Curated annotation (Swiss-Prot):
Protein name, per record: Eukaryotic translation initiation factor 4E-3
Keywords linked to the UniProt accession: Cytoplasm, Initiation factor, Protein biosynthesis, RNA-binding, RNA-mediated gene silencing, Translation regulation
Biased composition (Polar residues): 230-251
Further details from the record: Inactivation of ife-3 results in 100% embryonic lethality.
Organism: Caenorhabditis elegans
C-alpha cells in the first residue's frame, strides 16, 4: 500500500465530498485500497450459549477510509465490558483455532496485567490500535502472508492482545514478526513477548502454556570464558540468548 493507514486517518473523517468543489484536495476524492480485505468480529461471552454462537461478524472493509470509519464508530478496546473480544482477521479466516488457516499456527501474546489497572485503558487502546494499523497497513513486509489476524481479549484478571500467524513451525518468520510487533507497539524491554502454538493452547491442562519462542525482557548475563576453547552458552540458550526456543515445544 503506497500510503500508510496512519497517514490517511484524516481522510476517513471527511464525510461526503462534493466532486464539483474545486477546493477539495484530490486525495479526499480517492479511496485508498488495502492489500487485503478484513473482517471485524465481536464476541460477548455467554455461559448459556456455545462459543461460536456468541461470535458475530461486525463488518468487512478493504480501504483505509472504511477502516477508520469503522474504528471511529465502535467501542474502543479499553471500553469493552469484561468477557468481550474483538477479532480482526483476513476475509475467509474464522477467528478460531480449528480454521484451516489457523490450525497449524500460533500467536504472539501481549498481556496487560491487572497490576497496571491505573493506565490499563490507555495501554490497551494503544496496543490494539497500533496492532490494527500494522496488520492492515502491511507493515510486516514479506512476512505479511503468514499473518492471519489480531485479537483483543478483555478480562478482569488481565487483558490480552495477540497476533495470530499461520505456521508455528517457521521460527525464523515468527521471530521476525515478533520483533516487528515489539517495535510497532513500543513494548519496553521489561515486558516479555511469548509465541504460543495453538495446538498447545487447545490441549493445555493449566492456565499457562510453554511458549515456543520468547523475546526476552533483557539480555542474559554474559558467559564467563573458561579458556580459549570455551564455547559453552547458558543452559537453555535458545530462548534467552537468541529469542528462540528449541525446535520442538514441550506441551
Amino acid at each position: 500500500m503506497s500510503t500508510s493507514v496512519a497517514e490517511n486517518k484524516a481522510l476517513s473523517a471527511s464525510g461526503d465530498v462534493n466532486a464539483s468543489d474545486a477546493s477539495v484536495p484530490p486525495e479526499l476524492l480517492t479511496r485508498h485500497p488495502l492489500q487485503n480485505r478484513w473482517a471485524l468480529w465481536y464476541l460477548k461471552a455467554d455461559r448459556n450459549k456455545e462459543w461460536e454462537d456468541c461470535l458475530k461478524m461486525v463488518s468487512l472493509f478493504d480501504t483505509v477510509e472504511d477502516f477508520w470509519s469503522l474504528y471511529n464508530h465502535i467501542q474502543s478496546a479499553g471500553g469493552l465490558n469484561w468477557g468481550s473480544d474483538y477479532y480482526l482477521f483476513k476475509e475467509g479466516i474464522k477467528p478460531m483455532w480449528e480454521d484451516v488457516n489457523n490450525v497449524q499456527g500460533g500467536r504472539w501474546l501481549v498481556v496487560v496485567d491487572k497490576q497496571k489497572l491505573q493506565r490499563r485503558t490507555q495501554l490497551l487502546d494503544h496496543y490494539w490500535l497500533e496492532l490494527l494499523m500494522a496488520i492492515v497497513g502491511e507493515q510486516f513486509d514479506e512476512y505479511g502472508d503468514y499473518i492471519c489476524g489480531a485479537v483483543v481479549n478483555v478480562r478482569q484478571k488481565g487483558d490480552k492482545v495477540s497476533l495470530w500467524t499461520r505456521d508455528a513451525t517457521r521460527d525464523d518468520v515468527n521471530l521476525r514478526i515478533g520483533q516487528v510487533l515489539k517495535q510497532k507497539l513500543s513494548i519496553p524491554d521489561t515486558e516479555i513477548l511469548r509465541y504460543e502454538v495453538h495446538k498447545d493452547s487447545s490441549a493445555r491442562t493449566s492456565s499457562t502454556v510453554k511458549p515456543r519462542i520468547c523475546l526476552p525482557a533483557k539480555d542474559p548475563a554474559p558467559v564467563k570464558e573458561k579458556g580459549p576453547a570455551a564455547t559453552t552458552s547458558p543452559s537453555n540458550p535458545g530462548t534467552e540468548a537468541t529469542g528462540t526456543s528449541p525446535a520442538t515445544p514441550t506441551p
